[in-house]
UniProtKB/Swiss-Prot annotation:
It comes from Xenopus laevis. A zinc finger (TRAF-type) spans 113-186. GO terms for cellular component: cytoplasm; nuclear envelope; nucleus. Its main location: cytoplasm. Signal peptide: none annotated. This is Zinc finger TRAF-type-containing protein 1-A. It is found in: Cytoplasm. Residues 1-56 are annotated as: Disordered. Keywords: Cytoplasm, Metal-binding, Zinc, Zinc-finger. Belongs to the ZFTRAF1 family. The keyword Zinc applies.
Length: 365
C-alpha cells in the first residue's frame, strides 16, 4: 500500500515565499509518488483575474495581433497603399517613407529608419508585396453597416453593395435634396413629389442649381488659370498632433518645416478655432494657417490651396486662398480647412497624422 509523501521543508518554505500553497494529489491506483501542486493563495490576488490575464494572449484574434505586426513603424497605422521596408525589414507606409526622405533633405542629413537607424533611400528600400497583400486581406469595418470585409473589397462594398450606404434620389437633377440609406431609396422615389411639380416650380429650383454649378465652374477655371503660372510648387504635408502648455491643454497640429518655391514654410491647424471645450460640441471644424519662415527681399504674393494627399481618402472641397507675405507679415489668418462635414473632421482627428497636399502659386507682376 503506497503512502502519500509530504513535500520537503525547503520546497514548502520557498513556495510560501512566492505566495503559493503546496497541495498534494494522490496518484490514481496508488502507484508511484504523489505529485505536488502549486495552488494560488489569497495573497497572490484573485484567482479569476490571474486566469484571465494568462488567457488573454490566446484569446486575441489573429487579425488583431497582425495589426501590430504589419503596421507602419512611423505612424503605427496599417498602410493604405505601398509598403516599404528598410534593409533590416522594418515596415513604412508610402506616406511616412516619403516624409522621412523629405525631412532628411531639409535637415541635410542622411535619412534613417526610426527603428534601427540604418540608412534609407529610394534605392536602399524596397516594397514588401507580401505585407501589402496581407494587409489587403485583413478585415475592416464598413462605416455604414458596421460589418467586416477584407480591406481590398471594402471600397467596392461601400460604393456599390452596402444596403446602408448613403445615396441620393434619382430626381436630384430636378431639385430633390433627399439623402438616405440605399434600402430606403425605392420607397422614397415612389413617394417623391418632384416629378409632379409644375414647370414654373421646377424652373425656380433649376435656377438655384445653375448658380451652384456656376460657382463650381468659377473655382475650377481659377485653378486652371493658376496652373498656367510660371512659379508653382507643391508638396505632401503631414500635420502632427501636439498639446499646448496651458493649464487646460488644447489640441493643435503642426507640420515639420518644408521647402516650396525655394522658401521654408510651416502649416499649423487648430480644432473649432481653439474653443475651450471642443469635445462638448457636436460640430467639428479644422482651420489652418500658412507661415513663411524664410526671410525675403520683397513682398511675395501667393495663392495656395490644400487637397487630399495621394495615400488618404479624406473628402475636401478645394478652396483657393490668397495672401501677400512680407518679413513683417509672414503668417496668414486661420482659414477653414474645406472638409465636407463633421464626420470627415472626426476621421481626421482619429488618425495618427493628417496627410494632405499643398499647392502654392507665386503671382508675379
Amino acid at each position: 500500500m503506497s503512502e502519500e509523501r509530504e513535500a520537503p521543508g525547503p520546497l514548502a518554505s520557498s513556495s510560501a515565499g512566492l505566495g503559493a500553497e503546496v497541495g498534494q494529489e494522490e496518484v490514481p491506483g496508488g502507484a508511484g509518488p504523489a505529485r505536488l501542486l502549486l495552488l494560488p493563495s489569497d495573497s497572490d490576488g484573485p484567482p479569476k483575474k490571474r486566469l484571465r490575464s494568462e488567457a488573454e494572449p490566446g484569446s486575441v484574434r489573429l487579425e488583431e495581433r497582425l495589426y501590430s505586426v504589419l503596421c507602419c513603424t512611423v505612424c503605427l497605422d496599417l498602410p493604405k497603399a505601398s509598403v516599404y521596408q528598410c534593409t533590416n525589414g522594418h515596415l513604412m507606409c508610402a506616406g511616412c517613407f516619403i516624409h522621412l526622405l523629405a525631412d532628411s533633405r531639409l535637415k541635410e542629413e542622411q535619412a534613417t529608419c526610426p527603428n534601427c537607424r540604418c540608412e534609407i533611400s529610394k534605392s536602399l528600400c524596397c516594397r514588401n508585396l507580401a505585407v501589402e497583400k496581407a494587409v489587403s486581406e485583413l478585415p475592416s469595418d464598413c462605416g455604414f453597416c458596421l460589418k467586416q470585409f477584407p480591406r481590398s473589397l471594402l471600397e467596392r462594398h461601400k460604393k456599390e453593395e452596402c444596403q446602408d450606404r448613403v445615396t441620393q434620389c434619382k430626381y436630384k437633377r430636378i431639385g430633390c435634396p433627399w439623402e438616405g440609406p440605399y434600402h430606403e431609396l425605392t420607397v422614397h422615389e415612389s413617394e417623391c413629389c418632384h416629378p409632379t411639380k409644375t414647370g414654373n416650380e421646377l424652373m425656380e429650383i433649376l435656377d438655384e442649381m445653375d448658380q451652384t454649378h456656376k460657382k463650381e465652374m468659377q473655382l475650377y477655371n481659377s485653378i486652371f488659370s493658376l496652373l498656367s503660372f510660371e512659379k508653382i510648387g507643391y508638396t505632401e504635408v503631414q500635420f502632427r498632433p501636439y498639446r499646448t502648455d496651458d493649464f487646460i491643454t488644447r489640441l493643435y497640429y503642426e507640420t515639420p518645416r518644408f521647402t516650396v518655391l525655394n522658401q521654408t514654410w510651416v502649416l499649423k491647424a487648430r480644432v473649432n478655432d481653439s474653443e475651450r471645450n471642443p469635445n462638448l460640441s457636436c460640430k467639428r471644424t479644422l482651420s489652418f494657417q500658412l507661415i513663411l519662415k524664410s526671410k525675403i527681399n520683397s513682398p511675395m504674393e501667393c495663392s495656395f490651396l490644400l487637397l487630399k494627399g495621394p495615400y488618404d481618402d479624406v473628402k475636401i472641397h478645394p478652396v483657393i486662398y490668397h495672401f501677400v507675405f512680407t518679413n513683417e507679415n509672414n503668417e496668414t489668418e486661420y482659414v477653414p480647412l474645406p472638409i465636407i462635414d463633421s464626420v470627415e473632421c472626426n476621421k481626421l482627428l482619429a488618425a495618427k497624422n493628417i496627410n494632405l497636399r499643398l499647392f502654392i502659386f507665386q503671382i508675379q507682376k
